[in-house]
UniProtKB/Swiss-Prot annotation:
It holds the Pfam family UDG. HAMAP family: MUG. One of its GO terms (molecular function) is DNA binding. It is found in: Cytoplasm. Excises ethenocytosine and uracil, which can arise by alkylation or deamination of cytosine, respectively, from the corresponding mispairs with guanine in ds-DNA. It is capable of hydrolyzing the carbon-nitrogen bond between the sugar-phosphate backbone of the DNA and the mispaired base. The complementary strand guanine functions in substrate recognition. Required for DNA damage lesion repair in stationary-phase cells. The lineage of its organism: Bacteria, Pseudomonadati, Pseudomonadota, Gammaproteobacteria, Enterobacterales. It catalyses: Specifically hydrolyzes mismatched double-stranded DNA and polynucleotides, releasing free uracil. This is G/U mismatch-specific DNA glycosylase. Coiled coil: none annotated. CDD domains: UDG-F2_TDG_MUG. The keyword Nucleotide-binding does not apply. Belongs to the uracil-DNA glycosylase (UDG) superfamily. TDG/mug family. Binds DNA as a monomer. Its EC number is 3.2.2.28.
Amino acid sequence: MISDILAPGLRVVFCGINPGKSSAHTGFHFAHPGNRFWKVIHQAGFTDRQLRPEEELQLLDTRCGITMLVERPTVQASEVALQELRSGGRELVRKIEEYQPQALAVLGKQAFELAFNQRGAKWGKQAMTIGTTQVWVLPNPSGLNRATLDKLVAAYRELDDALATRGQ
């Protein structure tokens, strides 16, 4: 079982789709060696050094958190059913209403569209909010995603810069 990393007063909560098999095995988020999450958030400015998956709780020191839409581990996110995503979206709204971070970053456009029934979502900041929490859609850092490291870092940096502009 992989636990959420959440606390009140966070700048951002990164929301993955669901754990991969490596994460399920180790108990840490984004644990597969091919997953670029830890590298991307460091290079985008969220952390002062590249954390390892087993250091995930140190994210709270940077006012960042992690959760997932769906708890069930799979090899590929495409194995997650629509009903699981919709249910996960409702649970995610509950968590965000409870913790009220400045921003929620859903990592994957299709997962966001399905979980929140939002067709035609664009990358970046969304029109919808959850309370006062901004909602962003960022590319998934999975090694299965064809996005280059530079494109991932640029997308995540846009969020970091937007939060810095707001004094967060």
